Amino acid sequence: MKKISVFTSIRSEYGLFSPLWLALKANNSFKLELLVGGAHLVEEYGNTISFIEADGFSIAYKLPFLYKGEDPDALTRSLSTLQLQIGKYFMENKPDLLMILGDRFELLPVVLAATLNKVPIAHISGGETTEGAIDNQ
């Protein structure tokens, strides 16, 4: 059985990812492990982890990495925390594949940790412009 880890951090990914998650969950050849963090775990962003759980998905690992604020210090602390958390997950769980969606800046520490742990990465989508996003300034 192949262990497929999927990282998600914002509500907008859920609608795009969920059909794939359902297919993986239904296939006995795969073990789906959801790595949920960021805005999904924050009340002011809707605590959207509850939507994922309500649809019957179990969460393998919660990643509470967001520091309050969007200044360079808060962003640096957030991304550093995420890299430590997800790096630990990769070392302990050794997934066969990591799936990510989009091109948000919080994916940088995720893919770096996966690369350092020799976890292959499946990248879905990217390149869209999000007004005001740090990578589009």
Segments and roles (model prediction):
Residues 1-40:
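N-terminal subdomain of nucleotide-sugar transferases
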Residues 25-31, 56, 116-119:
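Short helix-capping segments at alpha-helix termini
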Residues 31-75, 85:
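Conserved nucleotide-sugar phosphate-binding/catalytic loop shared by glycosyltransferases and other
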Residues 7-8, 14-23, 65-137:
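Active-site and donor-binding regions of nucleotide-sugar-utilizing enzymes
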